[in-house]
A protein has these predicted regions:
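Metal-dependent phosphoesterase core characteristic of DEDDh/y 3'-5' exonuclease domains
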Residues: 2-35, 55-146
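Metal-dependent phosphoesterase signature
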Residues: 31-53
């Protein structure tokens, strides 16, 4: 689940679906994310493959990466440790939630949808879809960096 800015300043969405190894896709997961067992069966790859793909396609070890909060970063680090593989990302990480709070002089953190609303932006796509969440977080970061 990545976003990449093209030369026009627009973001391009791309999803990588991971085959779960310690759980199954259940009804709750499907309702929350839109990911179905059939989608994973058709397009899913193992976490290790996804890490290699990210390294190869994005040269991610050399780039700063970002997320809205630390949850995704921690999950990636934990899974890499669990599997004994190298994290495909650099140590340079931007916590967009924290930067948003700091930029706006807020005392409390807020979720992605509320942060967008605070900036007079609508959430685009499906909340909890990795690609859509990444896209919307990138929109916030772009506004902060202007």
């Amino acid at each position: 689940m990545r976003t990449k800015q093209n030369n026009a300043g627009n973001f391009k969405k791309k999803s990588i679906y991971i085959i779960p190894e310690r759980s199954k896709i259940n009804k709750f997961c499907t309702e929350l994310t839109g990911i179905t067992p059939q989608l994973i069966e058709e397009k899913g790859i193992y976490f290790e493959e996804a890490c290699e793909k990210i390294k190869d396609e994005y040269h991610s070890a050399q780039l700063t990466w970002a997320g809205f909060g630390n949850f995704d970063k921690e999950q990636i680090m934990e899974q890499c440790d669990y599997l004994g593989i190298e994290n495909p990302f650099s140590e340079n990480y931007i916590n967009i939630m924290y930067q948003f709070k700091k930029y706006n002089g807020l005392f409390k953190m807020m979720g992605l949808k509320r942060a967008l609303h605070f900036m007079n932006m609508d959430f685009e796509g499906n909340h909890h879809s990795g690609a859509d969440d990444a896209y919307n977080a990138a929109r916030i970061l772009r506004e902060i960096l202007r």
